Design a protein with these regions (language model features):
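Active-site segment of SDR-like NAD(P)-dependent oxidoreductases
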Residues: 182
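Glycine-rich, histidine-containing beta strand-loop boundary motifs that form or position
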Residues: 52
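Structural preference for beta-strand elements that scaffold enzyme active sites
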Residues: 9-13, 45-49, 84-88, 106-108, ...
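Active-site-adjacent loop and "lid" segments of alpha/beta metabolic enzymes
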Residues: 18-39, 55-81, 92-97, 101-104, ...
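N-terminal and secondary-structure boundary signal
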Residues: 1-5
Length: 271
C-alpha cells in the first residue's frame, strides 16, 4: 500500500464507548455493535473501525483492561455479522492490538499516535503483518488542543508523517497509511489548511486516510451541532475536497453518504 491507492474506500466508525463526541455512533448494549456493523456493511462500508477508547479532545482516560474488554467483545460481534469485512482497531495500546491480531485476520491497526505512545506497538504490528494507520497528533486527548501551534501546519504535518512512515517501514511494518489528524491538536484554520494541502501529504507516496466526519471545525464554522443535518452536508462537501486531494479512505459516521460521494466523484472524473 505504500503507493497512491488506485481505489477509494469507506471506513465506518463503530464506537464501543459511552462518550464519543457523536452520540449516534456509540454502540452500547446487547447486540448493538452487530446491528451497527451490519447496517454499515449493507450501506457499502469496506472497513469497520472499532474503538474502545474515545480520543476526542478532553476525553477521560480508560483503563487498558476496560478498553480490552470493549474491543474484544465488539470484534466478536462484528465478525459474527461481517466475517469477511476488514476490521480496523482504533487503539494506541499494544495490548489491545495484540489481543485482536492474535485471534483474527484481516485486521488494520489505527493508531492515533503513529506508534509513539506505546513502544511495543510497532513490534506487534510488524510481527502480525498488519497494515497500520499512522496519524499526526500532539500530546494526549487531555492536552492536545493546547498544543495547536504551527508556523506552517501542512509542512509540519507532512514532515512528521514522512519521518514516522519511514521509521515504521524500517521496523518491519509492511503497509503504512497516513492520516493528517484532522481535529487533533489543530485549530479550525489548521484543519481547513490541511484539507486544501492534502495533496502535498499524498505526494509522500502512501495512501491517505481522511477523518473529518462531523468534526468540530465543520460544526463551528456552520454554527451547528454534530447531530445536525448541516454537519453531514458540510462533511460531504469536504469529503469531495479530500478526494480531490488524493484521499484513499474516508473514515465516516454516515456510510451511505460517503459511498455516494465517492461514486459521484469517480463518475465526474471518469475514474
Amino acid at each position: 500500500m505504500n503507493t497512491p491507492a488506485p481505489y477509494r474506500r469507506v471506513m465506518a466508525i463503530v464506537n464501543a464507548t459511552p462518550d464519543s463526541f457523536y452520540a449516534p455512533s456509540r454502540s452500547e448494549g446487547e447486540g448493538a455493535v452487530a446491528r451497527r456493523v451490519a447496517e454499515c456493511v449493507a450501506e457499502g462500508a469496506d472497513i469497520v473501525d472499532i474503538g474502545g477508547y474515545s480520543t476526542r479532545p478532553g476525553a477521560e482516560v480508560v483503563p487498558v483492561e476496560e478498553e480490552l474488554r470493549r474491543v474484544v467483545a465488539a470484534v466478536e460481534e462484528a465478525r459474527r455479522v461481517a466475517p469477511h469485512t476488514t476490521i480496523s482497531i482504533d487503539t494506541f495500546r499494544s495490548e489491545v492490538a495484540e489481543a485482536v491480531l492474535s485471534r483474527w485476520t484481516n485486521v488494520v491497526i489505527n493508531d492515533i499516535t503513529a506508534g509513539e505512545a506505546d513502544g511495543r506497538m510497532v513490534e506487534v504490528v510488524a510481527h502480525w503483518g498488519a497494515p497500520m494507520v499512522a496519524m499526526h497528533t500532539r500530546g494526549t486527548p487531555q492536552t492536545m488542543q493546547s498544543l495547536a501551534h504551527y508556523e506552517d501546519v501542512v509542512a509540519e504535518v507532512r514532515e512528521y508523517l514522512a519521518r514516522r512512515a519511514e521509521w515504521l517501514t524500517s521496523k518491519g511494518v509492511k503497509e503504512v497509511i497516513l492520516d493528517p489528524g484532522f481535529g487533533f491538536a489543530k485549530s479550525v484554520e489548521h484543519n481547513f489548511a490541511l484539507v486544501e494541502g492534502l495533496n502535498t501529504i499524498g505526494a509522500l507516496g502512501y495512501p491517505l486516510l481522511a477523518g473529518i466526519s462531523r468534526k468540530s471545525f465543520i460544526c463551528r464554522t456552520l454554527g451547528v451541532e454534530p447531530t445536525d443535518g448541516l454537519a453531514l452536508a458540510g462533511t460531504t462537501a469536504l469529503h469531495w475536497e479530500c478526494l480531490r486531494g488524493g484521499a484513499a479512505i474516508l473514515r465516516v459516521h454516515d456510510v451511505a453518504a460517503a459511498r455516494a460521494t465517492i461514486e459521484l466523484f469517480e463518475k465526474t472524473y471518469k475514474l
